[in-house]
Amino acid sequence: MTTLGHAAETQFHGPPNLQGARPGASVIVLGAGLAGMLAAYELTRAGYKVKILEFQNRPGGRNWSLRGGDTYTEMGGATQKVGYAAGNYFNPGPWRIPHHHRTLLHYCKAFGVSLEPFIQYNHNTWMHSSEAFGGKPVRFNTAAADFEGNIAELLAKSVNAKALDDAVTLEDRERLLEALKGWGMLDKDYKYVSSLRASAHRGYDRPPGGGVNGAPIASKDLNSLHDVLDPQVWSSIGFFMGHEMQTTMFQPVGGMDMIGKGFAKQVEGLITYNAKVSKVAQDDKGVAVTWTDTATGKTTDAKADWCVCTIPLSILGQMDLQVTDEMMAAIKAVPYSGQVKIGLEMKRRFWEEDESIYGGHSFTDQEIALISYPNNNMFKDGPAVLLGAFAREMGAYRLAGMTPEQRIEVALQQGSVLHPASYRKEFSNGASVAWSRVPWAMGCCARWNEDTRKEHYQTLVGMDRRIVLAGEHASYVGCWMEGALLSSIDAITRLHKRALEA
């Protein structure tokens, strides 16, 4: 099917074939994120001598979870001590895995990382726009059904007015009308009106039941064409049609950092933590990396034949790096996005118990952008953590300029618009991560555009003598773990080829 252009997935054809490594050949890997650990794992299997230097005291890089008792200090000095209950967590970075990210799924299975479903599309969540529906949230299924119904009625009018006769044949005209009636839940006159037919999609005023009052009552207050044409409505519906956002999705059982921990077990003993790299030099014979142990202050030079560098470009561009001017220009040309995520722990699962919301996302045009509900431990008593903000662009810019406490307050204010009865009442504690303030990344992920890709991408992913870069920034699957892994496989495959030719 893939050869016919159907069911296409990312470019993963299995683990790399790195046969024939020269005895004693060595590689130093900078960064113990997923790209770095995969590179080390596959190179070690091939016979290379590998060492990983990692700035932090843990593996995973941006593959990260915050738990109760954790402490996080952002740039500017603000420190948060996470107060979540035991077993709860917040994923500040990646948090979901599309079904077609075959590389990541392959290695999760190979490394024993257990996955569970991530509920992406939930018809019963909320959709909110300050410019539509009187500024009040409506259920997602209601807005989506009314969008379809209003658009179908409008198009049916055009067909019946013969406005499309030049575009469709007589046969297709009848088929189109039939499709519009079915898709848009129109009546016999091609009108979108209150009916049991429409309620079967958007919900009832009284749902079907049993006994004397079992007959359903159709919902009467349909939303207008004007309201459903609000950009928040159609963009939220279209969100789930994007290839990267389509179901099925997955998440690791127990938190996203389980992936980093699973990878780290495969390269146990190869990682040096608390290693701050300050300089990377190279010549025709090898690579020398100067790094400092942040715990002791001791500075060391590490040498190897080759280097796989997975440090984010936002950091790498500030380092003493001996590469060509073209490579350095490419590194400095790519900006990073600055998303803000906020994890709020609530005393109980009111979204489940009071509103029948089990997983999925509610959307809003406020700065928080969305609320995402946990996919694990459903129906359980006790506290749970929901994602109270995934702010982007100007919303993220404003939130990043606040203190962590101020961010929590904004999340509570704006989240209360969607859950007015429970949000503040059930709030326990929270944590936030503004990616532009993360000291070891200074941004969430690389943001290429057409011009920068055309000018710099091939330089960035090419080998610079004995140094090759890897990470989501060196891929066309940017901001996803899949991109990091695919770039890693590509980088070490080319490094291996170069090593055999040397």
Regions of interest found by a model, annotated:
Residues 4-14, 286, 338, 352-502:
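Conserved flavin/dinucleotide-binding core of flavoenzymes
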Residues 15-157:
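N-terminal glycine-rich phosphate/pyrophosphate-binding loop and immediately adjacent elements
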Residues 18-21, 81-89, 234-248, 389-398, ...:
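Short glycine/proline-rich turn/loop motifs
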Residues 120, 130-168, 316, 347-368, ...:
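Rossmann-like dinucleotide-binding core of oxidoreductases
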Residues 124, 131, 159-276, 284-286, ...:
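Active-site/ligand-binding neighborhood in enzyme catalytic cores
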Residues 130-139, 278, 283-295, 434-454:
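Charged, often glycine-rich, active-site loop that binds/positions anionic groups
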Residues 273-387, 418:
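Mid-domain catalytic core of redox enzymes
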